[in-house]
Amino acid sequence: MAKSKGVRIIVTLECTECRTATAAEKRSPGVSRYTTTKNRRNNLERLELMKFCPQLNRMTLHREIK
């Protein structure tokens, strides 16, 4: 028997400020990304969380990407 897909899915969160920051503002090159899970039934819209960005060395808004 095949298993049905679960309710929880894995999503990737990306820093919104790393894309627009200049090289002088960043501590290291690149974009901060986190992976987490979300409940497909409860959260239909994209997830937004405040997370620590190691490139900017502060808390920034991270949004779900595809």
Swiss-Prot record:
GO terms for biological process: translation. InterPro entries: Ribosomal_bL33, Ribosomal_bL33_sf, Ribosomal_zn-bd. Keywords: Ribonucleoprotein, Ribosomal protein. GO terms for molecular function: structural constituent of ribosome. Pfam families: Ribosomal_L33 (PF00471). GO terms for cellular component: cytoplasm; ribonucleoprotein complex; ribosome. The keyword Ribosomal protein applies. Signal peptide: none annotated. Belongs to the bacterial ribosomal protein bL33 family. This is Large ribosomal subunit protein bL33B. It comes from Synechococcus sp. (strain CC9605). The lineage of its organism: Bacteria, Bacillati, Cyanobacteriota, Cyanophyceae, Synechococcales.
